[in-house]
Amino acid sequence: MCGNESIKVLKEPSENFPFVVINKPKGLASAPLREGEDCALTQAIELFPQIKNVTGKKTVEYGLVHRIDTATSGILLIATEQDAYNKLLEFQKEGKFIKTYTATVYNPENKNIKTVVQSRFRPFGPKGSMVKPVFEDGSTADLKKCGPKFYTTRIEISGNKAVCSIAEGYRHQVSAHLAYLGCPVEGDKLYNPHYAGEEIMLFEASKIEFTNPVTQKNVTISL
């Protein structure tokens, strides 16, 4: 493990709950690029080796149901049984796996906003390190370079606090949609033009909601 960047177990797996729920700290990757690299998943496997019984989207990701960016802290869900993992992927495709993020945002006018932002995305910035939301009235170049799928973020902003929920996520989706609204995340070096170079990104994956495939009961886990 690296420094103080260690996961915290929020919920352990059981017969009726074949998942591990962890709180990932900022600065720790969700998944490894190569087997055994220090990351949230590797640390979880050290505690719960049965995670390796699951075949995931990528071989080294095993039962990891979803990722959050390295700079983001918060909740991750990891399956310990294949059937449960497969079912959760189906729920994600059906929009039944809801992830909520909370953020401190730049909002000097103290605007109160409640809206839904829906867009496609295209790579943007140096070496495609960022994404740009693309809307129906976008430029010809943007419309050519964006993907075909639309992604939706439900956003509520009150002062400098934002709560954002998504059912299906794209890379940097929430950060890019908040920046589009003129309320970028404080400490976001990619999407906040006011970033001064030293701030910590104030962004957290604070809640997940899904149906437990074993019990068919709704589950809500929050920080």
What are these regions (language model features)?
Residues 1-223:
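RNA pseudouridine synthases
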